[in-house]
């Protein structure tokens, strides 16, 4: 069994925030693979799903981002899932928009959801890093992640979540390299090989106007 966690903040106010792309991806996995309805459990919302031959629990912690580890730890203990079989989907500032990378363990890069999970559960879990790009200035990060995706970003966000969902059985099977490659090819095929952040797009537009 796998525990697949999407990180985000609960409530309509945060639903389309960049910080909530983990929730969006897990919702799409649930939709594509016809998961059971989400129920309130483990200080979050949880649903069972079959991904290929692997049974998985989808989890969206409802504790707010900074306390995500409480929810993850509760679900992990209940199902007795090894930490290596916990997979966390989260927004990644240090990855270009529309890119995806999978890694095991490592640092938290200032991500408070990961920091909470690491503190309460340990570090050797798999992370699916969903690139949202960086606003360019550290002082802008807080507002950037807690703002909604711009309208111009929504198409690639939807396509990234769909590609993640389509190939989730590979992720559940532990075939991380194949999963990552399939998502990359799907995104390239949809024209998302190079995507600028809104700030980068604005600068490029200003340069073109001069």
Curated annotation (Swiss-Prot):
UniProt keywords, alphabetically: Cytoplasm, Hydrolase, RNA-binding, tRNA-binding
Binding site for tRNA: 14, 64, 66, 112
The keyword RNA-binding appears for this protein: yes
InterPro entries: Pept_tRNA_hydro, Pept_tRNA_hydro_CS, Pept_tRNA_hydro_sf
Site residues (Stabilizes the basic form of H active site to accept a proton), renumbered to this chain: 91
Primary enzyme class: hydrolase
GO process terms (BP): protein quality control for misfolded or incompletely synthesized proteins; rescue of stalled ribosome
Reaction catalysis annotation: an N-acyl-L-alpha-aminoacyl-tRNA + H2O = an N-acyl-L-amino acid + a tRNA + H(+)
Gene Ontology molecular function: peptidyl-tRNA hydrolase activity; tRNA binding
EC assignment: 3.1.1.29
Active site (UniProt): 19 (proton acceptor)
Record GO cellular component, one term: cytoplasm
Residues carrying the site annotation Discriminates between blocked and unblocked aminoacyl-tRNA: 9
tRNA-binding found in the keyword field: yes
PROSITE patterns linked to this entry: PEPT_TRNA_HYDROL_1, PEPT_TRNA_HYDROL_2
Compartmental location: Cytoplasm
Main location: cytoplasm
Biological function: Hydrolyzes ribosome-free peptidyl-tRNAs (with 1 or more amino acids incorporated), which drop off the ribosome during protein synthesis, or as a result of ribosome stalling.
Oligomer status and interactors: Monomer.
PANTHER family: PEPTIDYL-TRNA HYDROLASE (PTHR17224:SF1)
Family per similarity comment: Belongs to the PTH family.
Record-given protein name: Peptidyl-tRNA hydrolase
Protein source organism: Methylorubrum extorquens (strain PA1)
């Amino acid at each position: 069994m796998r525990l697949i966690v999407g990180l985000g903040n609960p409530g309509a106010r945060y639903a389309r925030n960049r910080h909530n792309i983990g929730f969006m991806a897990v919702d799409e996995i649930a939709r594509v693979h016809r998961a059971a309805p989400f129920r309130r459990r483990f200080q979050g919302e949880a649903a069972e799903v079959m991904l290929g031959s692997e049974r998985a629990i989808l989890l969206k912690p409802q504790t707010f981002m900074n306390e995500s580890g409480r929810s993850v730890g509760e679900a992990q203990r209940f199902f007795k899932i090894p930490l290596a079989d916990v997979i966390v989907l989260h927004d990644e500032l240090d990855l270009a928009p529309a890119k995806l990378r999978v890694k095991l363990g490592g640092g938290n890069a200032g991500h408070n959801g990961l920091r909470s999970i690491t503190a309460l559960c340990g570090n050797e879990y798999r992370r699916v890093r969903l690139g949202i790009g960086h606003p360019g200035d550290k002082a802008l990060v807080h507002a950037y992640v807690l703002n909604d995706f711009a309208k111009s970003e929504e198409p690639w966000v939807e396509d990234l979540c769909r590609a993640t969902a389509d190939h989730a059985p590979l992720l559940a099977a532990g075939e991380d390299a194949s999963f990552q490659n399939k998502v990359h090819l799907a995104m390239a095929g949809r024209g998302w090989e190079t995507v600028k952040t809104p700030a980068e797009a604005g600068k490029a537009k200003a340069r073109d106007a001069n």
